Regions:
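Extracytosolic ligand-binding ectodomains
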Residues: 1-193
Length: 193
């Protein structure tokens, strides 16, 4: 395990140490353009194994900054990043497509990202649970906060742009197995694996 700070301008020492261990695969935990620096450093030092990134790297910045060095990278993602590649019967296809259309109309083509998709999904959840909570309690009270919690935990299967949620008292993660995708950088773009 090696660490780096967002403000670091080089991760050469960490990359050399990791490459010398010759693991089959490595996981980079960083976001956006910051995920490109360690990835590039590993490739530049001759690493040939698989390099995986977290969902936080599922932005165009990874490819913009990483260039050819991030070709073949694996990234976990929710469907909102690549709705065009989802099969027609995927539960999130419609909402993911709607999210991308609305987001890119305001911020420009190719600017979609995981984080904006999660904000869109938060609105979907709030639109479902707030009416329930408002029937149970007055906003601004402890009872209202409890009513929101209870409504979320009992909202049932809810399709969002990043997959399907099904919260419960025991499951605050919420996402079902229909959610996650593995993307690979191929020719400077995302491809569902």
């Amino acid at each position: 395990t090696e660490r780096f700070a967002r403000s670091d301008t080089s991760v050469t020492a960490q990359a050399l140490k990791l490459v010398s261990a010759n693991p089959d695969a490595m996981l980079v935990v960083a976001s956006g353009s910051g995920a490109a620096m360690p990835h590039k450093a590993l490739i530049e030092r001759g690493y040939k194994g698989k390099i995986c990134q977290t969902h936080a790297a599922a932005t165009r910045d990874l490819m913009r900054v990483g260039g050819k060095d991030v070709e073949g990278a694996f990234v976990v993602s929710g469907p909102a990043v690549i709705p065009e590649q989802l099969p027609a019967d995927h539960p999130s296809k419609a909402l993911a497509t709607d999210f991308v259309a609305k987001y890119e109309k305001v911020y420009g083509a190719g600017n979609r990202n995981q984080f904006a998709g999660h904000a869109y999904d938060a609105v979907v959840v709030l639109e479902k649970v707030l009416p329930v909570a408002l029937k149970a309690a007055k906003p601004g009270t402890p009872e209202f906060r409890a009513a929101i919690r209870d409504a979320v935990q009992n909202m049932g299967r809810t399709v969002v742009s990043h997959g399907v949620l099904n919260y419960s008292k025991a499951n605050h993660w919420g996402f079902t197995t229909e959610t996650g995708l593995i993307l690979k950088v191929v020719n400077g773009d995302w491809k569902v694996e």
